[in-house]
């Protein structure tokens, strides 16, 4: 295997959130098609236009080395989303933490386009892969939660670049190259993509068979699929560390889990992990999860960030959304929309297609934007002051970034 040759089948990609939460605002993505040669790598940052009414999180901007002024010159929402679609379609997405990928689809449906992650061939979470390499391979230590700290831990990138999304992508590439070089079988197994993952899950579901799981939180154990739905699979999971405490999980297409046949738990690996495999299998065979399934059904919706968006639609909302997904312009049919959906359309139009607003609508949009800014302003400035106290006073790049963050609201 030549790890230095380009492989167009996958793409290194990091979402760049500018607000907290799985439904927060996405400010940019940084990506590179899979040229493994770090020295020649040229990451590309694509920013999305940030409307005036949305104040980003200063700590998120600072942590990623992103000036808010770059976002003011980004692509409008639908153009941004269509560009990401070109990047991820029919490719494996290689990222650090799969938990951030739903932001891409939340962003897509907010501008009335289809979710993008299902168009990919699958997800490789390098953080999860590093956990698996520690459990099943020869990696001496598991990863840390933060990409930057893990890059230091594995000594894969020693550049002196200032903090930036582009630097973070280079660190991701460095960890990816290390894992592919030293743990190629694991990496290549994940390159089989979503089709292989679904095949193993289907096998478990149809045969009530236990299989292995390394999840995105770095837990290793066995599981059995109990229920298959459009939103994902409900599984019974038993961790290596707690063989007497089974619990339910929901697995969907946003996860970077490593799912494999039970045979990966060889006798030697079980001894090294301190895993009582036979005890776990016995617990699984005797456990009746039916009492938990009904209660879990409502909770599991929290794992799907798009659930709230789609579940609240009426028929007119759905018709508007379907039309807008497949046309350059949004639908003109808005009279029968629900009030909540109508507000979404109004704010989107004000954010990205302001010329379509009447004078009265424009005044209303300006009023709503001002209210939004005033609501968030004090928290924004407080967060910025905390950054000043934490910053390295001897680092001019940090000082310049904080100054740009502090001055941003006054520029609006």
What spans do the regions from the language model cover?
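Entry/capping segment at the start of metal-dependent catalytic domains
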Residues: 1-40
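Active-site-proximal helix-loop-helix substrate-binding element of RNase H-like nuclease domains
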Residues: 48-72, 123-169
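Signature of the SF2 helicase/ATPase Hel1-core->accessory helical subdomain module
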Residues: 30, 43-48
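Short, flexible loop/turn elements at secondary-structure junctions
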Residues: 15-17, 51, 99, 128
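Acidic, Mg2+-coordinating catalytic module of metal-dependent nucleases/exonucleases
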Residues: 92-98, 107, 138-195
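Conserved DEDDh/DEDDy metal-dependent 3′-5′ exonuclease domain
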Residues: 59-136, 276, 284-291
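Substrate-recognition/cap regions that form aromatic- and gly/pro-loop-enriched pockets
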Residues: 279-382, 386
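Acidic two-metal-ion nuclease catalytic site recognized across multiple nuclease folds
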Residues: 177-278, 282, 376-412
């Amino acid at each position: 295997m030549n790890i230095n040759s380009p492989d167009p089948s996958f793409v290194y990609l990091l979402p760049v959130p500018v607000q907290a939460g799985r439904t927060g605002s996405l400010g940019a993505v940084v990506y590179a098609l899979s040229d493994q040669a770090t020295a020649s790598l040229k990451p590309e940052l694509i920013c999305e236009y940030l409307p005036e009414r949305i104040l980003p999180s200063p700590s998120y901007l600072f942590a990623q080395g992103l000036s808010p002024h770059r976002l003011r010159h980004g692509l409008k929402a639908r153009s941004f989303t269509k560009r990401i679609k070109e990047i991820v379609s029919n490719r494996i997405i290689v990222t650090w933490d799969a938990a951030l990928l739903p932001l891409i689809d939340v962003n897509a449906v907010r501008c009335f386009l289809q979710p993008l992650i299902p168009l990919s061939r699958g997800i490789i979470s390098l953080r999860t892969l590093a956990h698996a390499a520690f459990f099943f391979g020869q990696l001496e230590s598991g990863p840390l939660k933060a990409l930057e700290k893990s890059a230091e831990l594995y000594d894969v990138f020693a550049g002196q670049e200032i903090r930036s999304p582009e630097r973070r992508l280079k660190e991701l590439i460095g960890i990816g190259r290390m894992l592919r070089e030293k743990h190629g079988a694991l990496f290549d197994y994940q390159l089989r993509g979503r089709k292989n993952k679904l095949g193993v899950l289907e096998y478990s579901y149809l045969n009530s068979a236990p299989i292995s799981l390394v999840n995105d939180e770095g837990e290793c154990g066995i599981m059995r699929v109990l229920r298959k739905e459009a939103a994902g699979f409900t599984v019974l999971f038993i961790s290596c560390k707690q063989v007497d405490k089974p619990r339910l999980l929901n697995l969907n297409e946003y996860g970077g889990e490593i799912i494999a046949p039970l045979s990966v738990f060889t006798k030697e690996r079980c001894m090294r992990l301190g895993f009582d495999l036979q005890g776990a299998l016995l617990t699984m065979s005797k456990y009746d999860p039916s009492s938990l399934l009904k209660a879990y059904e409502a909770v599991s919706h929290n794992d799907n960030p798009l659930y709230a968006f789609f579940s609240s639609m009426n028929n007119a909302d759905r018709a508007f959304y379907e039309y807008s997904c497949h046309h350059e312009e949004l639908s003109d049919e808005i009279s029968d929309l629900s009030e909540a959906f109508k507000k979404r359309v109004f704010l989107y139009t004000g954010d990205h297609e302001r010329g379509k607003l009447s004078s009265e609508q424009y005044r209303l949009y300006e009023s709503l934007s001002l209210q939004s800014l005033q609501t968030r302003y004090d928290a924004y400035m407080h967060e910025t002051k905390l950054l000043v106290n934490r910053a390295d006073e001897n680092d001019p790049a940090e000082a310049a970034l904080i100054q740009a963050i502090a001055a941003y609201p006054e520029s609006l």
